[in-house]
């Protein structure tokens, strides 16, 4: 079963949100429906980056790696980088 690490960008204030999920489309829909408290006031959101992982553990580790950078510049470089 695949898991995804994703980055959303708010169309309201350009902030980024980083998360992981097993069902990417459903999760994005939940964010845009206001069913996630942190992202609700910043709706709407668009998907700007995603990575597929083979298991939950590796997706969670990657999510943590991205979040611990706490750098908008790093996120924007990641978004612009070619996928392999």
Regions found by a protein language model. Give the residues of each.
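GIY-YIG nuclease catalytic motif and its immediate N-terminal context
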Residues: 1-43, 50-53, 57-67, 71-72, ...
């Amino acid at each position: 079963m695949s898991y995804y690490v994703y980055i959303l960008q708010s169309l309201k204030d350009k902030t980024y949100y980083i998360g992981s999920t097993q069902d990417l489309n459903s999760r994005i829909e939940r964010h845009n429906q206001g069913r996630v408290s942190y992202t609700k006031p910043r709706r709407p959101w668009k998907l700007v980056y995603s990575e597929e992982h083979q298991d939950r553990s590796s997706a969670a580790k990657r999510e943590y790696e991205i979040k611990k950078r706490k750098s908008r510049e790093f996120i924007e470089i990641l978004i612009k980088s070619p996928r392999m």
